[in-house]
């Protein structure tokens, strides 16, 4: 059973009394929420109803202002319903504060500490900036020649102000402005760069010494990180490529190095790409160029290959003789069963002999006479 609440319990107390003067500039929509409390304070036989109303105001931007209800709620359910809006409002403010912090961090490049950025110049910094602007204005238009810089389409400029990175990331392509004396910049080339890894002496898994060289193709993917996180990104990438080539091929056998070059190149590319990601570098391709073996090992491998070829030739010759013997056996069994076939074979042999020597005269004899003479 619902009962009408009293005026004392229905009148809300606004949270922000200081904003009452701006009520004329804000269109407020009010929603009246009523609920009943069918539970008592702990008595099982006594049933009483408690109803309270709150006025919730929302402005044009959708921000909800929850007033604090007046009146003393009865029972546990009444107290819980009264405190829930305040708890939800506090949680909403905390969630909004965390989302704003995450949004701020999302503007920083990956693998970059936000402390590196110019979050506050201080009094000295603002003073020096003011002096710099005064110098630019007083020497105008000559100062434009020193302050206006241009970067190409394939370049980016990383600007430092009093030793700190300025917000907004790298500048370019196009024109950008640099304050004299307090700002400096570094140009970064974003085009793909290739270099050859010098031949590396490697001891393979099967204890064979070999020399291997490779070619690496990479580019700078994040100009700000490549300048702030590593002193010389190109030199560091070259050294890392040499050590990675030695370490990776040292775990493989010589046969794997000679036969699986593409697989080894893909594995090396993955390792280098993961290692240089924090430097703002993207490894695009790796190619193993040449594998050099010692002279003694080359001679031994050549002798082994020659012996393998000779053994294979002997096996092929033996298999041919075996097949020929089987064919002769089959032919003999056929000739034994048909005397006419033997006579035809005899005449064919005589024809072959007569074709080689034209001066030879051959008189063919019947096979019965030949058998009689033989017996």
Swiss-Prot record:
The keyword Nucleus does not apply. Residues 1-75 are annotated as: Disordered. It comes from the Eukaryota. It is found in: Membrane. It holds the Pfam family Band_7. The chain crosses the membrane at residues 120-140. SMART domains: PHB (SM00244). It is a single-pass membrane protein. One of its GO terms (cellular component) is plasma membrane. InterPro entries: Band-7_stomatin-like (IPR043202), Band_7 (IPR001107), Band_7/SPFH_dom_sf (IPR036013), Band_7/stomatin-like_CS (IPR018080), Stomatin_HflK_fam (IPR001972). Residues 11-50 have a biased composition (Low complexity). Keywords: Membrane, Transmembrane, Transmembrane helix. May be involved in cilia-related function. Belongs to the band 7/mec-2 family. PANTHER family: BAND 7 PROTEIN-RELATED, PODOCIN. This is Stomatin-2. It comes from Caenorhabditis elegans.
């Amino acid at each position: 059973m619902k009962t009408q609440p009293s005026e004392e319990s229905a009148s809300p107390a606004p949270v922000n009394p200081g904003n009452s003067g701006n009520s004329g500039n804000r269109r407020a929509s009010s929603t009246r929420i009523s609920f009943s409390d069918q539970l008592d304070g702990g008595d099982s036989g006594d049933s009483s109803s408690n109803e309270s109303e709150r006025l919730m105001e929302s402005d044009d931007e959708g921000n909800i202002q929850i007033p604090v209800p007046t009146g003393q709620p009865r029972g546990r359910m009444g107290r819980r319903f009264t405190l829930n809006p305040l708890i939800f409002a506090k949680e909403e403010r905390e969630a909004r504060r965390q989302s704003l912090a995450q949004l701020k961090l999302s503007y920083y490049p990956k693998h970059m500490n936000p402390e590196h950025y110019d979050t506050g110049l201080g009094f000295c910094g603002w003073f020096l900036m003011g002096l710099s602007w005064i110098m630019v204005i007083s020497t105008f238009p000559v100062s434009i020649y020193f302050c206006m810089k241009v970067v190409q389409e394939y370049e980016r400029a990383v600007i430092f102000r009093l030793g700190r990175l300025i917000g907004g990331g790298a500048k370019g392509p196009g024109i950008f402005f640099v304050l004299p004396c307090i700002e400096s910049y570094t140009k970064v080339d974003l085009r793909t760069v290739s270099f050859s890894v010098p031949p590396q002496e490697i001891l393979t898994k099967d204890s064979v010494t070999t020399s291997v060289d490779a070619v690496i193709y990479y580019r700078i993917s994040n100009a700000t990180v490549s300048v702030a996180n590593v002193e010389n990104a190109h030199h560091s990438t070259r050294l890392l490529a040499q050590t990675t080539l030695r370490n990776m091929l040292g775990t493989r056998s010589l046969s794997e190095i000679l036969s699986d070059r593409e697989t080894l190149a893909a594995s090396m590319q993955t390792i280098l790409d993961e290692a240089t990601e924090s430097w703002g570098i993207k490894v695009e391709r790796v190619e193993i160029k040449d594998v050099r073996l010692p002279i003694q090992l080359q001679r031994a491998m050549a002798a082994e290959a020659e012996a393998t070829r000779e053994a294979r030739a002997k096996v092929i010759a033996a298999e041919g003789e075996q097949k020929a013997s089987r064919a002769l056996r089959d032919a003999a069994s056929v000739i034994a069963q048909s005397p006419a076939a033997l006579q035809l074979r005899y005449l064919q042999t005589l024809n072959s002999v007569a074709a080689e020597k034209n001066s030879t005269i051959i008189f063919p004899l019947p096979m019965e006479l030949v058998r009689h003479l033989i017996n």
